[in-house]
């Protein structure tokens, strides 16, 4: 069957002009005009999408099939062009019968030409074919318009859905024109209103926690500059942490007798609830004879030294992708969970604005991965925000997953961000050593976002920087009061 693209070529119908007319009609629609006025950043993103629209319209015309009636008429016209005037006069009754049978718009005009001229001359033959061709061009142009109008309606419906989605998410995720462009590209997926409203919800939560948003922006845009000390530079106070052995809550090492109420074994605590044994419990408490967990580890104290002030700064290090690990243990539920998810959303905003990748890993008893900056970033973000934090804590697996990811060539300059309350077992030595190697040799930076003031020093000391956001009730009230 004849395709519309072939018919356009045969009749020299310019499809480009028709396509441009449809594009201009689409851009002039009231829906787009209002949207561009409300979200000017997204106007450029939609303008960059125009080549894709043109290609979609061309593809529609290229693949479209010409109706059988029009195909038969075109084939008859082509055959008639090859006939001389004498042969054409012989075939003329069959041609007129065909035009009437196909209900061709040219049938009446053709019959009138024949009836009004007793003699069919070569000039009349040429005029007959010229008007027939003109009729075919009109029919072909109308068919082009019909198909492109259907495509325009479908395209407008798609654009309206994407505009609704992008308009809702633009205040949350689009910081600049580049971010708006990437957000528009991501909006091509099939999403329902109830899905992306989850992103809006956490965006509103982030707006209510300006300190958390500010912290995410500081972390996301922190860069270390290369520097050298200047001669005769003044001295400044430099504080370092020095490790020394101590009995601190680091690792369970056994059982001992003491009066440490916080480390009581459950059986000892149970005796306190038995009336007959209550006095016995107090006696053993005074004599420090209660069975408690024995904890050993390493403590750190601050050492103050003097060193020359660093003055000269050179080029800043390039900013690479984010690899964000989020603790989904039970202790991270509730307000901690909201803060962790909102923090990741803020990092996604930074990544979109700075053209960086943002890779999320959830760790509890297993590792789940999401990439928030890819073509399906919005869908991935919705899946991440839908997760519930109810697992255990396996921070060692988290670090091993980060180390494995950083071995890839595309992650050679990545920054690792671990969001947790850091109430967990100490890290194995092989993990600590590998992290140190990545920091020294490959200049990877490891950031900790501590959601609790009780994180274990043995875990947190391996990070290059610790960003603290205490989610305790006292800190939350203080932050609200300061606002």
UniProtKB/Swiss-Prot annotation:
UniProt GO cellular component terms: cytosol
InterPro entries xrefs: Uncharacterised_CoxE, Uncharacterised_ViaA, VWF_A, vWFA_dom_sf
Cited Pfam families: VWA_CoxE
Keywords carried by this UniProt record: Chaperone, Cytoplasm
Keyword Nucleotide-binding applies: no
Cited Gene3D superfamilies: von Willebrand factor, type A domain
Segments forming a coiled coil: none
Protein localization: Cytoplasm
Described function: Component of the RavA-ViaA chaperone complex, which may act on the membrane to optimize the function of some of the respiratory chains. ViaA stimulates the ATPase activity of RavA.
Family: Belongs to the ViaA family.
Subunit structure: Homodimer. Interacts with RavA.
Name of the protein in its database record: Regulatory protein ViaA
